[in-house]
Amino acid sequence: MFNKITKQIQFGRDTVTLETGQIARQATAAVMVRIGDTQVLVTVVGRKEANPGQNFFPLTVNYQEKTYATGRIPGGFLKREGRPSEKETLTCRLIDRPIRPLFPKGFMNEVQVVATVMSSDKNRDPDIAALIGTSAALSISGIPFSGPIGAARVGYKDGMYILNPSYSELAESALDLVVAGTEPAVLMVESEAQELSEDQMLGAVLFGHMEMQPLIQGIKEFAAEVGTETWDWKPAEQNETLKAAIKDKFAAALGEAYTITEKMARYAKVGELRDACVAEFATGEDGAPEADEVKDLFGKIEKSVVREAVVSGKPRIDGRALDAVRAIDCQVGTLAKTHGSALFTRGETQAIVTATLGGMRDAQFIDALEGSHQDHFMLQYNFPPYCVGETGFIGSPKRREIGHGRLARRGVEAVVPSVQDFPYTIRVVSEITESNGSSSMASVCGTSMALMDAGVPLTAPVAGIAMGLVKEEDGRYAVLSDILGDEDHLGDMDFKVAGTARGVTALQMDIKIEGITEEIMEKALNQANAGRLHILGEMNKAIAESRSEVSDNAPTLLTLKINPDKIRDVIGKGGATIRALTEETGCTIDIEDDGSVKIYGETREKADEAVRRVEEITAEAEVGAIYEGKVTRVVDFGAFVAIMPGTEGLLHISQIAEERVEKVTDYVNEGEIIKVKVLDVDQRGRIKLSMKEAKED
């Protein structure tokens, strides 16, 4: 019934098992990959024909984590998985980025990759298994694909690199780096680090690439055993005569257009030339080329003109040298009522970044496969259409926005204090108001300044820079600092580095071509370091270190410690006491099981009042102290007196007066306020009071 094929590959200390032929047989290809007790089903479906008029490659990647993978039932009313989580969205991008460049140019057939986590041992992140499964499924699908690729996660501890570290190992690691690539070349890097050097980061990339080689070889053997024939697909033949004619007519004008430094004016001029080209060659007559073909060839010539100018040593599009950073303007405190704000402008890229401080209850609840936890640091990135002069839909964040927000977060997270050292929930929002390349790195810079403006005690300022590469087949290449949007689009590499003056905190690399050597990566990292230090110097002119106090607009945080036995008194029956406290003082009160109390107030006065009330409720009677108390009950043998909220003591009849007391009500009555002295507190917390000794004192 099944033609099941299995392949086992030794991958470091793990065994990777690939299986096909039993599950999802109607898909173009399906592979179940297993590492330990983690199992991920990856399916690939490709259409044999492209849709008419298709002018882009419709690749879709979906990654989904099923709660049954860890033996849990989803929460919520519907009890089923909902829209993709941020983690799932980020993993979709992680899979998409290294495979997309390996499909041939001109391939417009729809391809969908679906990776489903069906079992998880909660020991390691399933994303590496999903990447491996995607590579294997594409390799046996027959779809044109220049793979396979391998993938590895790399940690770093005590001067040693760790291949595919577990969650517990990552918690103690100074690095979390994912690298993917083919046998000869690295294609993608995603990482966060604790201020490591450029050499340590490059070493991690090369270590991961070396360690994945057995995996790549194993997938090749697996594909050979499956034996699927590659599709008989050939790209459409290019009209070289037409291309030469367009080049002769428009190459020089395009070169002139790309000397216009202002983005919108340059786009307008290139648009005019494109329209003129279409009008001249796509005449609509019999035998004349279609407009789409003319536009495509015009775009190729445009790309070659810009690239040739770069590698031949001419000034860049905006007139800069290869290693020059655009003009920078930094401001803090730009928004009056926010807790912290910054305006960061670098050339035609601009971000307004805000930092908001909240209480512990404001933390984001994360329900993940490896377990639930609270996130006390959030960074959200918004890219509205107006930032590039366009109209468009504004709504929930797209994959790109989620990815850029996470990259910016990785860049600054290493310098943000722990929640134990700074017990606030922090939300940062980066609003991109102008964009012409490197907006995620502008978000890193703006975030660093906004947090310092809010009084968050960062260990060091952080800056980010995007690097680019143009590499021609003849070996000539140029590494570009602080790339423009056009340089990103027309170049061969997008290389983003964030860090402090001491080291790298985040690195993201996407390479569109093979043949990026260690020498090129080293040059890019060193050039990025110089650019980062320059940007930090410009940022320091606006704010060089965190303010000594949190913003006046931020909630005041006061902490105190109470006896854990008194927690129930603060909470009260059914939460009545703490509800009244929060409503009457306007403060948020968080109480830990160990008696730690955190009070967040809109003003210092409100927070002080809440502290006073809590101390009043939790105060313990001090032997020898005199209190004014209210008589709550009168009995034959004395009276009960409330000396503090929730605290009563017994005033025995013998302690009311010096003379013999026959009748208690001759001296005290219910509701009366009297002075009493605490004589003793026994082991059970019972308090003995004296009225006569209070009078003597």
UniProtKB/Swiss-Prot annotation:
A GO cellular component entry from the record: cytosol
Cofactors that this protein relies on: Mg(2+)
Binding site for Mg(2+): D488, D494
Annotated localization: Cytoplasm
Catalyzed chemical reaction(s): RNA(n+1) + phosphate = RNA(n) + a ribonucleoside 5'-diphosphate
InterPro entries documented for this protein: ExoRNase_PH_dom1, ExoRNase_PH_dom2, ExoRNase_PH_dom2_sf, KH_dom, KH_dom_type_1, KH_dom_type_1_sf, NA-bd_OB-fold, PNPase
A Pfam entry, by short name: RNase_PH
Chief localization: cytoplasm
GO biological process: mRNA catabolic process; RNA processing
EC nos: 2.7.7.8
Keyword field: Cytoplasm, Magnesium, Metal-binding, Nucleotidyltransferase, RNA-binding, Transferase
Enzyme type, top EC level: transferase
Entries under NCBIfam families matching the protein: polynuc_phos, PRK11824.1
Family membership: Belongs to the polyribonucleotide nucleotidyltransferase family.
Reported function: Involved in mRNA degradation. Catalyzes the phosphorolysis of single-stranded polyribonucleotides processively in the 3'- to 5'-direction.
Subunit structure comment from the entry: Component of the RNA degradosome, which is a multiprotein complex involved in RNA processing and mRNA degradation.
Entry protein name: Polyribonucleotide nucleotidyltransferase
